[in-house]
Amino acid sequence: MTVKALTQISSAGRNGVGAFVLQCKKLDIHYSDWAGSSRGMNGFIKSLLPKFAAANPQIEFVVSPRPAKHPILMGHYINGRTKAICVRNMEPLEILKKAELLRDASGEKPQKFKKPVTSTNPSVRGVWSPYHGQGMAV
């Protein structure tokens, strides 16, 4: 019997069965020391990032400079997708909210729902129509 490597750690559809697996596995933080648009990112890296990284030990944080470019946060997910958010001219607290958004995201593409409620079973009562039943007396 041969041993095969896992292609994925977990799927988003079965998360919660057994144990919770955080979908974000890596967070890349790119900044520039020279550009003025990275002022908030530099403040985030110095003040808020150590606490955020300590609170989330299951995520790998990579901080790397990108000279003369706008700062970005890039999340890598266990399903293989990545999401990037440009955080130019943002304050450190706004960048923290964007980092939390990337941490909590599933990594899946946004899906458009045709109906506000999705169900596998149709309604027992059917769809309401003003043309059925007694109607209104005028």
UniProtKB/Swiss-Prot annotation:
One Pfam family cited in the UniProt record for this chain: L51_S25_CI-B8
Subcellular localization(s) per the UniProt record: Mitochondrion
Protein name in UniProt: Large ribosomal subunit protein mL43
Family: Belongs to the mitochondrion-specific ribosomal protein mL43 family.
SUPFAM superfamilies in the cross-refs: Thioredoxin-like
Subunit structure: Component of the mitochondrial large ribosomal subunit (mt-LSU). Mature N.crassa 74S mitochondrial ribosomes consist of a small (37S) and a large (54S) subunit. The 37S small subunit contains a 16S ribosomal RNA (16S mt-rRNA) and 32 different proteins. The 54S large subunit contains a 23S rRNA (23S mt-rRNA) and 42 different proteins.
GO molecular function: structural constituent of ribosome
Gene3D superfamilies: Glutaredoxin
Broad class of where this protein is predominantly found: mitochondrion
Keywords of the record: Mitochondrion, Ribonucleoprotein, Ribosomal protein
Cellular component per GO, a single term: mitochondrial large ribosomal subunit
Alphabetical GO biological process terms: mitochondrial translation
Task of the protein: Component of the mitochondrial ribosome (mitoribosome), a dedicated translation machinery responsible for the synthesis of mitochondrial genome-encoded proteins, including at least some of the essential transmembrane subunits of the mitochondrial respiratory chain. The mitoribosomes are attached to the mitochondrial inner membrane and translation products are cotranslationally integrated into the membrane.
SMART domains: L51_S25_CI-B8
